[in-house]
Structure formats: C-alpha cells, structure tokens
Amino acid sequence: MLAEALPWLQHFRDKIVVVKYGGNAMVDDSLKAAFAADMVFLRTVGAKPVVVHGGGPQISDMLRRVGLEGEFKGGFRVTTPEVMEIVRMVLFGQVGRDLVGLINSHGPYAVGTSGEDAGLFTAEKRLVDIDGTPTDIGLVGNIVNVDATSLMDLIDAGRIPVVSTIAPGADGQVYNINADTAAGALASAIGAERLLVLTNVEGLYTDWPNKSSLVSKIVASELDAILPGLDAGMIPKMESCLNAVRGGVNAAHVIDGRIAHSVLLELLTMGGIGTMVLPDNYAREDYPEGTVFRKNYQDGHA
C-alpha cells in the first residue's frame, strides 16, 4: 500500500494542502483522532497541511446551554452580538483547542490561530439572499483581504496551523465567517496545491439524492453551470472549490469525512474517494501519473 502511494508522496512534498475540517469528522471521537493522525502523517512525509475549521454543532450546543436561540437564514447562522460571543469562544477556545491537542499528542506540530491574529483575514458584512432579497443577519462576514505573512512563518517553521474562522472588519466589528468560504480564500492566497473540504456525503451529487449522480471529476466551467441547482448545503462547499481552482489552486476535493483517514485516501491513492474539481485548462502532467478518475461529469452528461 505505501509503495503504491510513492508518486503521490513525492508530488505533495513541500506543497501546501488546505483542509476544511467539519461535519461528522469533528464530532466523532475516533474520526477526530484519525483526522489528527492524517495531518501529522502529511507533515511527516514533507507536505504542509493547514486546517481551517468551523464548529456548527458545537456552537448550536453551547447556545442551547446558555438559553440563546440558534437561528439560520439562507444557510447562514443569524449572528447577534450575544451569539458572536459564543461563536468566538467555541471556535477558538473549544473546537480549535481540541484539534490542536489531538495533533500535538503526536508531537509539537499544531498551533491554534484565527482570522483575528496578525491581520490574517479582513472581513466586511455579508448580506444573505433570502427569497431574492439581500438581508442583514447580523455579524456574518465575507473575507475581503488575506494577509498570510504570519501564517507562512508558522508553515515554514514546520507547524500545522489550525485556523478559526472569525475575522475583524475595518468597521471595528468582528465577523463570523463561513468556514468553507474561508478555506477557499486562504488556499488561493497562500498558493496551496490542493484544497480538501470534508462533508457528510461521498462527494458531489449533481442530482441529490440520486446515488448514480455522484461524480469523481468535474472542471470549473461545468461546476459553475450546475452550481445554482445543487442541494443548498452543498453550494457553499462547491463555491469554495470553484473559487479556489480559479484562484490558482491545482485541484479542490470534496470528500466524505465519515470515513476514517479520508484525507489520505483521497490524496494518496489512484482513484481517491471523493469529487475532484479541476481548472478548465488543467494539464494532465501536473497530476501524479497513475491518477484515475472514476467518473467524469461528462460521462452522465454527453
């Protein structure tokens, strides 16, 4: 098995891989441990992993505990100043710290950071489309600038950054940022080789829940064309992948985080396990020889 992975191990040496950590992988203890081990494995073989995480389930749980209403509109959490206090506390103080601890059980690799630290992210308020109307749902933001100087110092020192997606605005407010969006923006800004997004499904279904509509490879223009019709929960994930490959990332992957070691299975095996999004002008020689695409988008859409 390891000998078969050699072309991929060589390919990812000294390359940055941004992983958006979410879904079941961040609530199941055995999956959390497997994910942490995957990050250490990548670092040990010479890749440069960077983790970006959300914390939806943990935030909802804490809001319930303190008696606050957790409300979503247009797929985004309504973020009042009171909710923002909880978001900030849970993301950086709980979810991020837990993952840093799991990774560091293997050695002193991980460092927790956030979009607020050393100006990593700058945000502005995001209006959310609800039935065609741009709507203010509180302290929800879009990233308008990435300054990765301090993050690159961590990466170059051999650390694994674990990034919480909260960010200051020029207006002095702190904003809650969708973690899928943040991961894509960061991957482009730091010249990542790959972006991986963990989900609770096998990959991209073009006609959810029709199992035969799962695709292994899709190029940016094909994804752009079908994006508005995708399942609502999948749109921010696929939009992040699309923006990443259009921003210079060689490929973006949506993978099933319910499978232990899904990151390694996707990156270091011939066919991978999820969906790979490629730039329109991708060159076959930029990807390890032996890479197999199980089902192209065109296969079902001649």
UniProtKB/Swiss-Prot annotation:
EC number(s) stated in the UniProt entry for this protein: 2.7.2.8
Keywords: Amino-acid biosynthesis, Arginine biosynthesis, ATP-binding, Cytoplasm, Kinase, Nucleotide-binding, Transferase
Pfam families for this protein: AA_kinase (PF00696)
Binding locations of substrate: G55, G56, R77, N176
UniProt GO cellular component terms: cytoplasm
Pathway(s) this gene product operates in, as recorded in its UniProt entry: Amino-acid biosynthesis; L-arginine biosynthesis; N(2)-acetyl-L-ornithine from L-glutamate: step 2/4
Residues marked Transition state stabilizer (site): K20, K237
Compartments, record wording: Cytoplasm
Catalytically driven reaction(s): N-acetyl-L-glutamate + ATP = N-acetyl-L-glutamyl 5-phosphate + ADP
GO terms, molecular function: acetylglutamate kinase activity; ATP binding
Biological process per Gene Ontology, one example term: L-arginine biosynthetic process
Functional description taken from the UniProt entry: Catalyzes the ATP-dependent phosphorylation of N-acetyl-L-glutamate.
Matching NCBIfam families: argB (TIGR00761)
Family: Belongs to the acetylglutamate kinase family. ArgB subfamily.
Protein name, entry field: Acetylglutamate kinase
Native source species: Corynebacterium efficiens (strain DSM 44549 / YS-314 / AJ 12310 / JCM 11189 / NBRC 100395)
